[in-house]
UniProtKB/Swiss-Prot annotation:
GO terms for molecular function: ABC-type vitamin B12 transporter activity; catalytic activity. This is Cobyric acid synthase. The keyword Translocase does not apply. GO terms for biological process: cobalamin biosynthetic process. Residues 266-464 form the GATase cobBQ-type domain. CDD domains: CobQ_N, GATase1_CobQ. The keyword Ribonucleoprotein does not apply. Pfam families: CbiA (PF01656), GATase_3 (PF07685). PANTHER family: COBYRIC ACID SYNTHASE, DETHIOBIOTIN SYNTHETASE. Belongs to the CobB/CobQ family. CobQ subfamily. InterPro entries: Class_I_gatase-like, CobQ/CobB/MinD/ParA_Nub-bd_dom, CobQ_GATase1, CobQ_N, CobQ_synth, GATase_3, P-loop_NTPase. It comes from Methylibium petroleiphilum (strain ATCC BAA-1232 / LMG 22953 / PM1). The lineage of its organism: Bacteria, Pseudomonadati, Pseudomonadota, Betaproteobacteria, Burkholderiales.
Amino acid sequence: MNGRTRSPARAVMVLGTTSGAGKSWLATALCRWYARQGLKVAPFKAQNMSNNARVVPGSGGRLGEIGSAQYFQALAARVLPDVRMNPVLLKPENDTGSQVVVLGEVRADLAAVPWRERSERLWPFAQDALLALMAENDVVVIEGAGSPAEINLHASDYVNMRTAQAARAACLLVSDIDRGGAFAHLYGTHQLLPAAERALLRGYVLNRFRGDARLLEPGPQQLLALTGVPTLAVLPMWRGHGLPEEDGLHDEGPGWQRGAGNAAASLRIAVVAYPRISNLDEFQPLRQLRGVQLRWARSAEELAGADWIVLPGSKHTSGDLAWLREQRIDAALARHAAARRPVLGLCGGLQMLGEALVDPHGVEGENGEGNAPGLGLLPLVTAFEPDKLLRRTDACFDGVGDEWSMLRGVQFGGYEIRHGRSVQHPALPAAAVALRNAEGEAIGWQQGSVLGLYAHGLFESTEVLRALFGARVRGLESVFDGLADFIDRHFEPGALMRLLADAEPGKD
């Protein structure tokens, strides 16, 4: 389609019978598969709920946030990510409330609006972004959210079938057969959709199947007879695809997750999994490293045996710090640091490692909830500011030593998403400035074996991985091509191009 006047785009949408069915990675695979056919492709998800976010170009030359899944999908599609690909991002802050990000920018005025009213106010932003992407591309690969057939939410659900209808999309419905009940999930979802929405379903996908696919017979044929929709693919269980799962933390057990290494020779890295953990996807490369074992630790006991302890990002630093103390993880961290064993804090984790959190503007809650003593492992004071700092960061390690000396001189590109601003405590001996950005600003500090950084993306840098572990991981291009090869093998021959033919062209 490239090289001539572009006809209206066609859309392929990935729906799921449940959360965690495999929508995100399949949408990513489709982005690369269609891009390899010479088509101009863009991803889209009307609304994402996640604390995994990336910094991308927004409107007016400003930077904004989108969900990490759409960021990776854009890279798979070989296009520059932008805020229209995920026009609404909800970042949970507590059990009942979320920060609302619209076209990359925080909209505080929408946070307290009731859900149904807010959905109607957000839909025009999502629709405009979708239509703009369809006007600029040959194919738009759309990811749904949860299930499209939640009958109590259906009237206000703009992320699934309302988006599908606006795009005139050919829809795939994915079910996780490893959980059991896949045929019932597919049939029930089909039956609960109104007739006009059912008509958009073009194929079923059975994901994460173990064993001989012939054991499924005659299920797909009976499902076709009942619904008129064919099963286009049975995808085998595949844990090694290399992409982070959007809800991957919740799928992990409490034990050490071993990559390619020998258990006895492995470096054990424990990541503290507090309730409002954010940007956990940046740890995905560690799962691929030979000789590294990863664990999500939710208690002091689960830190036992760790060589490194990592405090990741947090969407609510003071709240997660209180939780950390309730679990007695603070004492375990102090012992670990006193033994000169590596402790790493990233963004919110860095803030926790300091002397104090100060919240004069109530960013983390009213009535002083955001004010708290820190862990005292770095001589820093962090103040939370109302304006969120978003930026892409080119940084260089310069003042690192001791346990982190192997990073000296290493450069990497990361990103920052934060309300906190940290400075050295004036009454305490200064920590070494460990990391500076291209402007020379300090964005990382070290004291003894404790290192705190504001830049996310550390473990996504091949230079950093080589310095820390003497290792390389598969590059993203290899991961994306592997995904495309996988679906090419397991979808019915010609099915993916037929989906485009079945999709109605978008409006000019």
